[in-house]
C-alpha cells in the first residue's frame, strides 16, 4: 500500500496500521520546496506488488490540489486501485468522478455544510471483490453491503439542506461584499506559504532526529 505525507490522518493512519498485519507500506513524499506530490516519484514506487495507492484530492495542510485524473490513470496502468480523500476539496469544487477515475472517493458531508455523514463512491469492479459487511440478505447489493446497521434515514434526509445553504451562499458572494472577494485569494496564498514553511520545518526536525 502506498500512502503520502500530504494526507490527513484519516486517509493514512488506518492504512499505515496495516503494517502490523504484514502489509508493506510505502510512502510517497511531497517535494518540500513546493508541497507537491510528483508523479515521477510515484512511478518509482509502483510495481506488481502494489495493491492500493491512497492520496488526497486536496491537501488539508497546504491546500495543494492534486491532478487526480492523471494520478489515477498511472495507478490503474500499474494494476493497482486508487483511494482518494476528497474531504478538503469537496467544499471548494465539484468532483466529477467520471473524469477523475478514482476507484474509491470519499468525503464527509459536514465539510459541505451538511450533517455528519461519510459519503463513499466505490467502483463496481472493486465493490465486487470486497466482502459483505451488512446483513446477509444485502450481500448482493452494491449500495447496502457496506452499511452494517442500515442507513441513518434522518441524517440522510437532512442532506437536502446543503442545497439551501449553497443557494444562500451564492447570493451572498456574488451579489454583495465584492471587496471581501478580492481579499480572499490573497489570504489563501498567505496561508499556503505559512503551511509550506511549517512542512519544511517538520521535515528538517525529522531528518535531524533520524
Feature locations, PLM:
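Pyridoxal 5′-phosphate
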Residues: 2-210
